[in-house]
Amino acid sequence: SRTRKELPGIDCYAGAAEFDAFLARTDILVSLLPATPETDGVINRRTINKLSREGPFGAPIIINAGRGRQQVAEDILAALDAGELHGATLDVFVPEPLPPGSRFWTHPRVTVTPHTAADSDPEVICAYVAHQIARHRSGLAFENLVDKARGY
């Protein structure tokens, strides 16, 4: 996280300065990060090798349902082959869709999931768009805007 949180009973980390400490306490890494210059390639061999080996499998697991640009495919496959990574569940890739010949399809310790969002209810979407239009007409700012400088 960019911003420190205080949650009872939970160790919280923030910023690049605490990334290695976070990784050292993490045996299952779940990435739901947006695609930004800061997150490009963050799931790489260095990151994998900093993860805890204290979990139930003796090697870490990664789950990426964020963006494909975050992961370095060759590093993940090499770490799996070397036993440095117990498994990977991947929902996103570069390129998408994942090519039929990719080793991710056949690697015994990789689970590939379809990158699909939930079904959208047209009535709910229309009501939300109408709400945003009403805000705009009233001189209020739109809600839930993307911060283009941050990329999410």
What are these model-derived regions, one by one?
Residues 1:
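Conserved acidic E/D residue at the C-terminus of a beta-strand in Rossmann-like folds
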Residues 4-102:
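Rossmann-like adenosine-cofactor binding region
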